[in-house]
Amino acid sequence: MLLALSPEASALRERLEKFVNERCIPAEEEYDRHIAQFSGPDRWTPDAVPPAIERLKSEARSLGLWNLFLPRPVPDHLLVDDDDGGGSHTMAPSMYLSNREYGMLCEVMGRSSLAPEACNCSAPDTGNMEVLLKHGTEYQQSEYLKPLLRGETRSAFLMTEPDVASSDARNLRTRLTKVTAAGVGEDGVGVGGGGGARYVLNGRKWWSTGAMDPRCGFALVVAEVDTGRPPAPSKEEEGRSGRRRRGGDQTVVIVPMSHPGVRCVRPLTVFGYDDAPHGHAEVSLDDVELDGSAVILGEGRGFEISQSRLGPGRIHHCEFSDCWGFRGRSTAFFLPVFPTAHSMLPIICHLLTLLSM
């Protein structure tokens, strides 16, 4: 039995299906043609961003298909001066969905590679927006969350490192060193807008999705706070020495990509594809100076933040990937053999949704 949606969510899903089938999928060829015009370094310039994506984003807003992922209402202080002229807000979704309801919309968006970004529901932005919405200060929300909610910028999440097994965040070696703590509150964030605490960030990250994008305005970076203690041992060292690894020093900070200490070393490829102009970068962080306003939630809260970010995001990724993969397989193998079987696609996609959940 297929999962039932409320009448409101069902109408939203039908509107989304029409948008994906009639606008996003036909635009994929135009998108690819534009990207094919660029080669080398110019693949990471603003000109390489296909105009089709901004056109689709504008259409999604007008259809009420914008920011569908949002799990909670947008704070009132962000909605000031955010009226589209018709009495509605451009950042808030047309309705707030449960995780199950949003999952069923993800399988619709997953049918087109353009639909998630067109609806402002693509990674890593969704996870970063959820973090800032749940844990960010008013300053962090106004400065970084608001442009993302409006679709004016992109972002990245920097966690994985080249020299360690980064699936265990206790292995991370990127260091956040506090150089002064004058005027710091109990939560470790500078008093009066973050003007007290000062930090220096050093390290190297890779597979940083979105960091190469010319629209990327900032990154959330997971780092270990330098407390003056020796670095935590690796898993192998832990076994040899018996010294336990710590888990309470990981901290998430906001780093502007325009900072002179931030350098995208190179784009990385997946099966030979660089995914320009979005991309997956190796990023060098050299003496990146930050103040207390860059710290999210406080020192040592990185695990808490990462769990709240990565949990729902993985489910959404599965929804997108299942249906995008099914569309490719059905086009190559299924429909040419059974050309009248397209009526079964919605049922099969629903079953994929159930399996993913």
Regions inferred by a protein language model and the residue ranges of each:
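N-terminal glycine-rich flavin-associated loop
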Residues: 117-139, 168
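A short, Trp-centered hydrophobic/proline-enriched beta-strand micro-motif
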Residues: 151-160
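A structural signal for short hydrophobic beta-strand segments in well-ordered beta-sheet cores
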Residues: 174-181
